[in-house]
From Swiss-Prot:
Keyword presence, Cytoplasm: yes
Annotated source species: Oceanobacillus iheyensis (strain DSM 14371 / CIP 107618 / JCM 11309 / KCTC 3954 / HTE831)
Protein name: Nucleoid-associated protein OB0030
Oligomer and partners: Homodimer.
Annotated region described as Disordered, given as residue ranges: 1-23
Gene Ontology cellular component list: bacterial nucleoid; cytosol
Functional note: Binds to DNA and alters its conformation. May be involved in regulation of gene expression, nucleoid organization and DNA protection.
Molecular function terms from GO: DNA binding
Amino acid sequence: MKGNMNNMMKQMQKMQKKMMQAQDELHEMTFEATAGGGMVTVKASGKKEIIDVEIKEEVVDPDDIDMLQDLILAATNDVLNQIDEKTNDTMGQFTKGMNMPGMF
């Protein structure tokens, strides 16, 4: 019985190490999304930090700031959703079969 418990603890430690490595790899990744046919591009790290916003000159219209704001929001939300999906896919492999809602 004690051997089984030790074995299980070793397995958990291995899984924890793999999870941390996967999380580190996610944090190092860069994600990119565009809106308006490439008029606005937003780049973010896997830590959900916005690292770059590119706006094409043609889309800057002082009389239509709302459109530019909408494009920035759309690209930002898209890139954040990409990060969430990748995180769920990557980390989900560790929680398959476990009942841990809202873990990631």
